[in-house]
Structures are given as C-alpha cells and as structure tokens.
C-alpha cells in the first residue's frame, strides 16, 4: 500500500526534524551558557 509507506516516510522525516532541532537547541543553549560564564 502506497499510503502506508508514505506515512512511514513522513513520520521518519518528522522524527529527523525533531532530532535536528533538539541537537540545535542543545548546541545553542550550551554556547549561551559558556558565553555567560
């Protein structure tokens, strides 16, 4: 079923975006902390 594979692809892309944004937030918060010290 094409819809099923597309759904998996979409959810995978969503998870990838979440991981990227989480890493970005982690990096930005770390640089903020180090600049404050």
UniProtKB/Swiss-Prot annotation:
It comes from the Eukaryota. This is Unknown protein 25. It comes from Pseudotsuga menziesii.
